[in-house]
A protein has these predicted regions:
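Intrinsically disordered, flexible peripheral segments
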Residues: 1-161
Length: 161
């Protein structure tokens, strides 16, 4: 079962550093985990990808992230409303509310390097493949927010003796 897919605005390949890097990640913000559990399959330059698209390099597959969803709200009225007014505490690693959208990433070094080398802009498509749900979950709209995909590259310099 598949929910509605998300495709990003084009990202300029010229703005992405892919040469001489040790790792490239695609980061996603505002991923909702209040509903169904799902695998987020990530494809580059394949906005038509769906749950039946083979996850391979030829189809632009970059990797997957996995969300263990809460399955909907089972508490009293107001229980599932996220308190956006709670002050941020840099010494408290917990989310301010269990239903606060999460940030996640996919290690996609080879896929991004391969796609960026073609010189065209890059679109990021996330295909949510539903793996678990309850009657209270909206399985069509598991991706409720703009995911703000960001391509991040890392350079590691290792000194040898």
């Amino acid at each position: 079962m598949q929910g509605n897919s998300y495709t990003s605005q084009p990202i300029s390949a010229a703005e992405i550093t892919v040469e001489d890097v040790s790792r490239v990640d695609i980061e996603f913000e505002q991923v909702d985990d209040s509903g169904a559990s799902f695998e987020g399959r990530v494809f580059l330059n394949n906005p038509g990808a769906d749950e039946n698209t083979e996850p391979n390099p030829e189809n632009g597959y970059a990797g997957s992230f996995f969300i263990f969803g809460h399955g909907g709200c089972f508490g009293d009225e107001g229980h599932c409303e996220v308190d956006t007014e709670r002050a941020f505490d840099p010494y408290d690693p917990r989310r301010s509310h269990p239903l606060t959208p999460v940030t996640t990433s996919v290690e996609a070094t080879e896929a991004v390097q391969r796609t960026a080398s073609q010189g065209a802009d890059i679109t990021v498509t996330v295909v949510p493949v539903i793996t678990g749900f309850t009657e209270q979950t909206d399985v069509e709209n598991v991706l409720k927010h703009d995911l703000h995909p960001r391509i991040v590259s890392y350079e590691l310099e290792v000194e040898t003796a």
